[in-house]
């Protein structure tokens, strides 16, 4: 029986004010000084990164900063996000009980606003007047443009040329919010190339510019800082699921690209050995085809975009182009804390193909009246398979990381819904 009462839920400030037992060392390494993470950046960026690190360590314990963050998260972004039991969807999951953590209902339509409000406030308190960001699906770009409009900061968003075409709606949203959107036409013209250009901008304009990194990757302190701003997802879900199901879940699942939404919901359950944590990465056309973004399934350790983690690379250490129908998962790397959790055996990472994700996308639309982001549909697809594996009555929490407004055209083409009248 679902408990309809509203439990007292934690605030964002509780997620960032105190260090955790899973924090990296002072050099940003998870799992020891020679472990995952670190800072693999040009010397020109070291002083800038140290400035960000010092500012974050100061502000994370500043009551003024924490109060501003809590106020904006509650009154502007709309936290807490609800936890919803998807009873009709559950009928397709071996009668497991599927609960959706509705990050799609946040302002701007995804979990990205959690991180961006924190970093934009930090940028302003550092005296920066200009914020840059990378984006794949456009959700981080929209959230960054939103926060910059709110706080009066100039905003430049770097986005791969392929992604600007397949996410044209989000490009328009960013421009409406006052951001400059730069379409990157080099390399694979996707997220990794957008990050490359953003780093170049940061090196050239560090005095007045803050780089608002969108995922739990990159050089220290970004993997930890982004995780801290996203931890609220799991902290809320942990309280909510015990109120509704009367116990902790059997499994918590999320899609994994760079990994911010996944680490955000996983973190609150890391010390619960009875809770399985499963991340679903983009297998594209199938791992065997080579057209995928399944970094853990087919990748290997290496340095990429400022940290040591897993990435898709050839035998010479050159990055291999990734592929996914989902722009937000079309990335050949992953955050270093995820690499540590994989090696420690705490989180299981599995591939989901484009076809499996789109089947789950359509099913969630029809069964629950919820149009998810295609990124999130990978997690839904994985949860459906895991439900059959775990059996009747198993409780599974899915991080529904974003809504699918941006993906309607892609979905309509996939399902053949754009025929002439």
UniProtKB/Swiss-Prot annotation:
Cofactor: pyridoxal 5'-phosphate
Any single GO CC term annotated in Swiss-Prot or TrEMBL for this entry: cytoplasm
Recorded GO MF terms: tryptophan synthase activity
Signal peptide: none
Residues with N6-(pyridoxal phosphate)lysine modification: 112
Top-level class of the enzyme under EC nomenclature: lyase
Function: The beta subunit is responsible for the synthesis of L-tryptophan from indole and L-serine.
Assigned keywords, A-Z: Amino-acid biosynthesis, Aromatic amino acid biosynthesis, Lyase, Pyridoxal phosphate, Tryptophan biosynthesis
Gene3D superfamilies tied to this protein: 3.40.50.1100
Family annotation (CDD domains): Trp-synth_B
Protein name per Swiss-Prot or TrEMBL: Tryptophan synthase beta chain
InterPro entries linked: Trp_synth_b_CS (IPR006653), Trp_synth_beta (IPR006654), Trp_synth_beta/beta-like (IPR023026), TrpB-like_PALP (IPR001926), TrpB-like_PALP_sf (IPR036052)
Family named by the database record: Belongs to the TrpB family.
UniProt source species: Mycobacterium tuberculosis (strain ATCC 25618 / H37Rv)
Top-level division of the source organism's lineage: Bacteria
Coiled-coil blocks: none
């Amino acid at each position: 029986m679902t408990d309809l009462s509203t439990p007292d839920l934690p605030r964002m400030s509780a997620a960032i004010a105190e260090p955790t037992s899973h924090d990296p060392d002072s050099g940003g390494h998870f799992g020891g000084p020679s472990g995952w993470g670190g800072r693999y950046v040009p010397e020109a960026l070291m002083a800038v990164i140290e400035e960000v690190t010092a500012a974050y360590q100061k502000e994370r314990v500043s009551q003024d900063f924490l109060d501003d963050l809590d106020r904006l998260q509650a009154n502007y972004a709309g936290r807490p996000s609800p936890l919803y039991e998807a009873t009709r969807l559950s009928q397709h999951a071996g009668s497991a009980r599927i609960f959706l953590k509705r990050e799609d209902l946040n302002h701007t339509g995804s979990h990205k606003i959690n991180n961006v409000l924190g970093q934009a406030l930090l940028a302003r308190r550092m005296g920066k007047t200009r914020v840059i960001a990378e984006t794949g699906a456009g959700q981080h770009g929209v959230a960054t443009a939103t926060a910059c409009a709110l706080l009066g900061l100039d905003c430049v968003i770097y986005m791969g040329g392929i992604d600007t075409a397949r996410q044209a709606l989000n490009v328009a949203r960013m421009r409406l919010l006052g951001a400059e959107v730069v379409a990157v036409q080099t390399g694979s013209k996707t997220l990794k190339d957008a990050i490359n250009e953003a780093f170049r901008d940061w090196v050239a304009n560090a005095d007045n510019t803050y780089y608002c990194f969108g995922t739990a990757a990159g050089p220290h302190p970004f993997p930890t800082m982004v995780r801290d701003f996203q931890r609220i997802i799991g902290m809320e879900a942990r309280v909510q699921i015990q109120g509704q199901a009367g116990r902790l879940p059997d499994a918590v699942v999320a899609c994994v690209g760079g990994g911010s939404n996944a680490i955000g919901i996983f973190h609150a359950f890391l010390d619960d050995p009875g809770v399985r944590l499963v991340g679903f990465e983009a297998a594209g056309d199938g791992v065997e085809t080579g057209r995928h973004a399944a970094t853990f399934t087919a990748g290997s350790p290496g340095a990429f975009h400022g940290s040591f983690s897993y990435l898709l690379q050839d035998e010479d250490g050159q990055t291999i182009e990734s592929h996914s129908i989902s722009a937000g998962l079309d990335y050949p790397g992953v955050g270093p804390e995820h690499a540590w959790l994989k090696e420690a055996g705490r989180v299981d990472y599995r591939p989901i193909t484009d076809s499996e994700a789109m089947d789950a996308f359509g099913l969630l639309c029809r069964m629950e009246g919820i149009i998810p982001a295609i990124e999130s549909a990978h997690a839904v697809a994985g949860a459906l398979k895991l439900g059959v594996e775990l059996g009747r009555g198993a409780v599974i929490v899915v991080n529904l990381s974003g809504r699918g407004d941006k993906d309607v055209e892609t979905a309509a083409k996939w399902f053949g819904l754009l025929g002439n009248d």
